[in-house]
Amino acid sequence: MTLIYPATADAFRCIADACRHTCCKGWEIDIDPDTRAKYVAMTGEIGQRLRDAIADTPDGASFRLREDERCPMLNDSGLCDIITACGEGALCQICADHPRYRNEFSTFTEVGFGLCCEAAADLTLHWPQPMTWHTQGGGTRPQGSPEEEALLQARAALIRIMQDRTRGIPTRLNALCEAAGTVMPTRTAAEWADFLRTLERLEPAWDTVLARLTNAPDDLPDFSPLAVEQFTVYLLHRHVPGALLDDDLTGRVLFCAVSGMLFLRLSTLLGENEAARMYSSEIEYSEENLCSFLDELDAAGDE
């Protein structure tokens, strides 16, 4: 299968123990069947620790998190004992992939880097050139199905709108909505905060952020044009392909535009990197929250 990567791919590096928000804490870490079998067969102290750490359920295996929600294989220095003892090749699939996400098409797969990872957020938001994507090993991308190609052409046009640096960010976000046949909802910062409070919370600190958003001015700040561009382009790249499954291209584009606007507001409160990391963690990495957001935007369109 041909893989398509963003221009940032070669520059991405996990910052390991320097990470302030480790991906080895607070998440359910599933263990794929092949890796589980490998862990069960391992000898020595690391093998015993792995067997003790595996929780088997009817839905599959996962790591049994500690009381502080840290993975039992994450040591006090913030490093993974599996990597230290056995190398990166011993990681389960989800750990080897993270923070990568995949968009699966009929003849190729797109791979990107989720912004819940602070290293990926820092790299993506401050990438100076308009984001591009490249086929692994060079060459051209294989042709997809007619439906896929139509959607990819639409997405490319939307990304061009967002990358038009002759226009301001609010103009670009509104142009995205117009291209999708909709308009940006006219809600205050406090109203958006009220909606976000109805969603599942993954970090307690999110409540504090939403309280600050409630009191934020309603005028959009003139702030972080590069970061907002890259953030919104990332969302378009990642979420527009979902329309192949739910046939909701308009809703998904509106989600990207609204999220770009909210990121702009949150960046003034938290800074660019933390705003992206928290928003991605709270919204993108909860399927329930993402679906609720799309439903809310669908309802807003009927108002």
Language model regions located:
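Hydrophobic, aromatic-lined core segments that form the binding pocket/scaffold
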Residues: 155, 159-303
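General N-terminal leader/first-domain-start detector
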Residues: 1-48
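Internal, well-ordered alpha/beta segment that forms a basic, Gly-enriched binding/recognition surface
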Residues: 78, 82-167
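Compact, glycine/acidic-enriched structural inserts
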Residues: 41-52, 126-135
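Immediate flanking context of iron-sulfur cluster ligation sites
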Residues: 1-19, 51-92, 109
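Short, compositionally biased low-complexity segments
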Residues: 11-18, 129-133, 231-238
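General secretory precursor processing signal
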Residues: 17, 22, 26-27, 74, ...
